[in-house]
């Protein structure tokens, strides 16, 4: 009989106790005596966020198809349970078996965004695993990281035994087999890390030495041993038809951020926007066969009971069989009470026709992502979108009955001028003007245009990776320019302007491009109580400033690398 790690008393005390009990529909139960490798798969955020992540579902399904492996899930406990676990010395546990993570062979952590870095330390500490790799002994699990942030893993190098670069479907089979071989040999912990470093795509930070220039930037990074590769190449799945995909994804007990069947239609993007890390990392573009996707749609809906299905990719409009797939989903499932959720599509006649069939026009809004206010700036970032394209798409939408538009822009892009910033308000005004050119009796009420600006963060492996980042004052000054210009527009009552937190952006930029010296600052911030930094109400910028000051890092340095 499976026993819960938390008592009824604790479960009735914390918010959303279903986060911690496991045993959901399609979760995999095995006898731990029948497997050779136990793997805890972690998303370092709250359950509802982690359960929405497709990558975890793919790897969970792939691992558990092996008879010799049992993969279980673990998420960051919310702050209420975090406090109780520390007070009562309860080790963090896996959802399926409810066993402590410290008893597993591996703890795999997907690292999707920089603002979860302190949560990684929370997971390690609550699991009673030493935070620093150098302090771990043979009885501790190996801690492995994956995901987009591992393309610059250096800020986390002190906390992880190894990372995989690229798509996990290609790496883990060989890694698990290597682990079994090492375990049977009885060799020490470093022996496994040396063996793992020979696997394409595996990076073991402790096997590399880093030297620095006088100004603090990296001079050289080289392997400590001749058999350790000097360069680690990312690994990708080239044949999408052969890539594993979960026909029975785990169904959460409580509403997740994305509580639906997800069909991944393609990987990669053909666009090449110069600021976009995902577009660069996930090259080349690879598409899934439309018949395979139709088959997955049937099976996944049947196996989950979900009432919604959505498409996943970086650029869905570029999927060659999009029209056939969307038409099939509408014809097959719309009449059966299944909602069809479409990603952001290029706004053209086909897209609007499709959206009108699956959305309530009076309630839904259309999203445009011009990214920059002027054509000059859009050319600099290689957006491939003209003002005529935007106005034509908006006009088609307005004529089709829509009256709500969301516009997404970035501030602080390289070579940006004040005119580029003001162009954001001017473009929004032109879109509003286009709406009011429609005869009044054909309009759907008042036009509502929401302008949102994020602040540019130069990310590794993008053409802008070495670009300087604006300071806090500069970011806020740019937002004020846009805000003032919006208020001066003729149709200002139809325009609403929101901007992202500048302090979060500053921190994200340092963590994205930092080196191993940043690890001590992350640890210091964690010791000051920083966790859930991606959650606005939990973010404490003042504590981060204290941590950087105490560890000797200059957060305002424009060329942080």
Language model features by range: what are they?
Residues 39-45, 63, 249-275, 301, ...:
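N-terminal pre-triad scaffold of radical SAM enzymes
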Residues 10-40, 47-48, 205, 211-262:
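N-terminal [4Fe-4S]-dependent radical SAM core
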Residues 195-204, 314-319, 343-349, 412, ...:
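A glycine-rich phosphate-binding loop feature that marks nucleotide/adenosyl-phosphate handling sites
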Residues 41-42, 46, 115, 298-450:
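Conserved SAM/AdoMet-binding glycine-rich loop
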Residues 1-29, 33, 39-41, 488-561:
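Radical SAM enzyme core and accessory elements
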Residues 276-292:
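Iron-sulfur (Fe-S) cluster-binding segments and ferredoxin-like electron-carrier domains
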Residues 67-80:
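A short beta-strand-loop structural module common to alpha/beta enzyme folds
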Residues 77-222, 460-515, 523-535:
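Glycine-rich beta-alpha loop elements in corrinoid/cobalamin-binding modules
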């Amino acid at each position: 009989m499976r026993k819960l790690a938390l008592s009824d008393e604790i479960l009735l005390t914390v918010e959303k106790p279903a986060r911690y009990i496991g045993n959901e529909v399609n979760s995999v139960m095995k006898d731990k005596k029948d497997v050779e490798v136990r793997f805890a798969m972690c998303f370092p955020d709250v359950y509802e966020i982690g359960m929405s992540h497709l990558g975890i579902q793919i790897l969970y399904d792939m691992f558990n198809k092996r008879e010799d492996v049992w993969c279980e899930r673990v998420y960051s406990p919310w702050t209420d349970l975090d406090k109780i676990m520390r007070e009562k010395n309860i080790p963090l546990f896996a959802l399926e078996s409810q066993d402590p993570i410290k008893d597993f062979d591996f703890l795999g952590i997907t690292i999707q965004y920089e603002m979860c870095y302190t949560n990684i330390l929370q997971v390690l500490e609550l699991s009673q695993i030493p935070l620093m790799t150098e302090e771990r002994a043979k009885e501790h699990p190996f801690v492995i990281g994956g995901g987009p942030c591992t393309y610059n893993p250096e800020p986390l190098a002190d906390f992880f035994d190894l990372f995989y670069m690229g798509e996990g479907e290609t790496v883990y089979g060989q890694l698990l087999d290597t682990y079994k071989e090492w375990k049977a040999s009885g060799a020490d912990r470093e022996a496994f890390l040396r063996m793992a470093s020979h696997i394409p795509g595996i990076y073991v930070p402790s096997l590399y030495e880093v030297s620095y220039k006088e100004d603090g930037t990296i001079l050289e990074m080289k392997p400590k041993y001749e058999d350790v590769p000097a360069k680690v190449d990312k690994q990708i799945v080239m044949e999408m038809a052969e890539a594993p995909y979960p026909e029975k994804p785990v169904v959460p007990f409580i509403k997740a951020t994305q509580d639906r069947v997800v069909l991944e239609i393609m990987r990669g993007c053909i666009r090449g926007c110069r600021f976009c890390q995902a577009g660069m990392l996930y090259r080349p573009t690879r598409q899934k066969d439309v018949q395979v996707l139709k088959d997955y749609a049937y099976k996944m809906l049947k196996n989950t009971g979900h009432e919604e299905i959505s498409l996943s990719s970086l650029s869905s409009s570029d999927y060659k069989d999009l029209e056939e797939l969307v038409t099939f989903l509408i014809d097959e499932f719309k009449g059966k009470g299944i909602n069809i959720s479409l990603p952001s599509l290029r706004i053209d006649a086909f897209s609007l026709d499709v959206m009108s069939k699956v959305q309530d026009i009076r309630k839904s809004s259309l999203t445009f992502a011009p990214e920059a206010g002027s054509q000059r700036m859009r050319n600099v970032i290689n957006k491939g979108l003209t003002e005529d394209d935007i106005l034509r798409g908006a006009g088609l939408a307005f004529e089709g009955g829509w009256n709500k538009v969301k516009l997404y822009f970035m501030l602080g892009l390289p070579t940006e001028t004040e005119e580029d910033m003001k162009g954001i308000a001017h473009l929004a005004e032109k879109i509003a003007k286009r709406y009011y050119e429609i005869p009044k009796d054909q309009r759907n009420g008042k036009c509502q245009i929401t302008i949102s600006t994020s602040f540019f963060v130069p990310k590794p492996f993008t053409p802008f990776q070495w670009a300087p980042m604006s300071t806090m004052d500069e970011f806020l000054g740019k937002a004020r320019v846009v805000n003032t210009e919006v208020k001066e527009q003729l149709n200002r009552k139809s325009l609403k302007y929101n901007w992202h937190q500048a302090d979060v952006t500053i921190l994200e930029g340092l963590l994205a491009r930092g080196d191993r010296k940043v690890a001590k600052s992350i640890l210091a911030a964690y010791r000051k109580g920083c966790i859930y930094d991606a959650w606005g109400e939990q973010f404490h910028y003042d504590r981060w400033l204290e941590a950087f000051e105490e560890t000797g890092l200059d957060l305002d340095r424009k060329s942080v690398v």
